[in-house]
């Protein structure tokens, strides 16, 4: 074999290895992408009670899993690469197993890093997310039927979820009892989503960053105390 053939064979092997590596990485990327899409479709991932804001949480969490072990209801899971969250961090899916709102909040009390606020005194102060009625068109109560399951299952009934009466314009004779979520009381436990009788729940618990807007600091409301009458 001539000397000139050796470099050519080396280049061919190099290019072949590059193509194989690129193909392998692309396949892994596609697989992870599909897994993440499946994970998102199966339900929204929520953080445990007492979790600090998401960016700080991902940095503070040491992935020890103690909160998962402390949960007596197997609500909490640890995220994988396919979960759409930082791997090793705790989460739960309300449609699968909602938070049972333990009074002693064991998951937060064992957190060693501060990712979960151990100083939280009442589970009623937790804000794991916010229940949002995402599908009024299919909600049975909005159709004029009496369902009320989400309302009756809510651990803060008549506080976090109330039923508001509205005249049924379709019949002209009856009232509709419309479930209404109050963000100042909702803990985001997810029990309402869990018990929704529809194939896909009409009410879902979303992270606060998705469920609520954010008011700019330049807005002032004159009717609120401390604004000196300015609007």
Curated annotation (Swiss-Prot):
Annotated [4Fe-4S] cluster 1 binding sites: 61, 64, 67, 71
Molecular function terms from GO: 4 iron, 4 sulfur cluster binding; metal ion binding
Recorded coiled-coil stretches: none
Main localization (coarse): periplasm
UniProt signal peptide: 1-41
Phenotype caused by lack of the gene: Deletion of both napG and napH genes has little effect on the overall rate of nitrate reduction during growth in the glycerol/nitrate medium. However, during growth in the glucose/nitrate medium, the double mutant shows a decreased rate of electron transfer that correlates with decreased NapAB activity.
Binding site for [4Fe-4S] cluster 2: 99, 102, 107, 111
Residues given in the record as [4Fe-4S] cluster 3 binding sites: 139, 147, 150, 154
Bound cofactor: record note: Binds 4 [4Fe-4S] cluster.
Function per UniProt: Required for electron transfer from ubiquinol, via NapC, to the periplasmic nitrate reductase NapAB complex.
Protein's recorded name: Ferredoxin-type protein NapG
Gene, per the UniProt record: napG
């Amino acid at each position: 074999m001539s000397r000139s053939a050796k470099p050519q064979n080396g280049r061919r092997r190099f290019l072949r290895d590059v193509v194989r590596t690129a193909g392998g990485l692309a396949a892994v990327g596609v697989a992870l992408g599909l897994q993440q899409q499946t994970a998102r479709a199966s339900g929204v991932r929520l953080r445990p009670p007492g979790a600090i804001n998401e960016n700080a949480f991902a940095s503070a969490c040491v992935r020890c899993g103690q909160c998962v072990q402390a949960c007596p209801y197997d609500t909490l899971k640890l995220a994988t690469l396919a979960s759409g969250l930082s791997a090793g961090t705790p989460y739960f899916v309300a449609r699968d197993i909602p938070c049972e709102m333990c009074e002693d909040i064991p998951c937060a009390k064992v957190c060693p890093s501060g990712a979960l606020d151990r100083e939280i005194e009442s589970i009623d102060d937790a804000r794991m997310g916010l229940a949002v009625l995402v599908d009024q068109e299919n909600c049975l109560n909005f159709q004029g039927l009496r369902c009320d399951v989400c309302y009756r299952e809510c651990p803060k009934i008549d506080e976090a979820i109330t039923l508001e009466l509205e005249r049924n314009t379709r019949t002209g004779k009856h009232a509709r009892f419309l479930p209404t979520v109050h963000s100042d009381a909702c803990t985001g436990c997810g029990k309402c989503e869990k018990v929704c009788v529809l194939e896909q729940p009409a009410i879902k618990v979303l992270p606060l960053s998705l469920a609520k807007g954010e008011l700019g600091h330049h807005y002032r409301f004159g009717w609120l105390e401390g604004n000196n009458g300015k609007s």
